[in-house]
Amino acid sequence: MVEYAQPNTLHSFHIGHARNTILGEALARLTQFAGFETIRASYPGDLGLSVITVLWMYEKFYKGQEPQGVHERGQWLSKLYVEANVLLEKKENETPEQTAQREAYEAERREMYRKYDAGDASVRELWRVTREWALEELRDVLRILDVKMDVWFYESEVDEPSKAIVEELIAKGIADDERPQGGAVIVKIDEKLGLTKEKYRTNVILRRDGTTLY
């Protein structure tokens, strides 16, 4: 199995994705030519805070303004992501009013993520529609590059199973649940492995709000 051509959805296909795609296709063709059974697989990141960021920006400022062309729409989604990050980024010497506005925007974005995570029908539908816009562009780019995927895996398909695994790790004492104290679910890697020279490696496996990581 060769895994490649897997950009995040709601972001336009760019030169970095092209490099990865061409390299992956070259490796797939070489293994196939050498006589090996070859499966071309893509694992797009179609979930996470970056995806929710675009949904929030669209819903709040740009709903119904999307262009109709496949590639124009994909590039437009990327612009929404950039604009959203400008609004959400803390500015140097920002005024109290600007701080309050930025924090309000951040709270709205987090609330949308919470709603998605809780299965809110309207947020899930918006996610499905915009996700398909991004995938339409990706499929067309792959067609242009003469790349044909055999299987598609999506991050959203492993979101719920991964939460179940986290709960299992907590139950087994491998992960520490610090959410009651305002923290996240973490694994203290050095402590669990009995390493003494390095004591600072900690892996966050679930955010404090219960959402998963990339």
Tell me the role of every PLM-derived stretch.
Residues 1-214:
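NTP-dependent nucleotidyl-transfer catalytic core
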